[in-house]
Amino acid sequence: MAGTEMRESMYNILICDDEKDIVNALKIYLNDSNYHFLEAFDGEEAVHLVDTNEVHLVLMDIMMPKLDGIRATLKIREEHSLPIIILSAKSEDADKILGLNVGADDYVTKPFSPLE
């Protein structure tokens, strides 16, 4: 019972990036005892994890295999209203505008600072 209560009080963050080093770096930057991290390495896996788990925040890369972050964000937005932050090396204004237009709440370019 206590374990279940602890799990429910955690803030679940889905990190979706095809680069394991980025996923690990984000987990280090965001290290907090109240965070539980889910990992996806492509957009299809990200959509599945959001559909099957209580996710409170998604950190989404754009350039990934199977389903890119733009399409994954669109699919997630069809059913969910949780915050999505795109983290991408694509830094053109058009990329940022597209990311925000498909439903991302913010867009941060890589490389990024933990303060961002």
Model-inferred region functions:
Residues I62-M64:
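Receiver (REC) domain active-site loop signature in two-component systems and cognate sites
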Residues F112-E116:
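C-terminal output helix
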Residues K20-L38, T52:
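Two-component/phosphorelay signaling modules centered on CheY-like receiver
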Residues D51-V55, K75-L82, V102:
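Conserved phosphotransfer cores of two-component systems
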Residues D42-E45, D68-R71, D95:
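Acidic catalytic/metal-coordinating carboxylates
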Residues E39-L57:
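Acidic, metal-coordinating helix/loop segments flanking the phosphotransfer/catalytic sites
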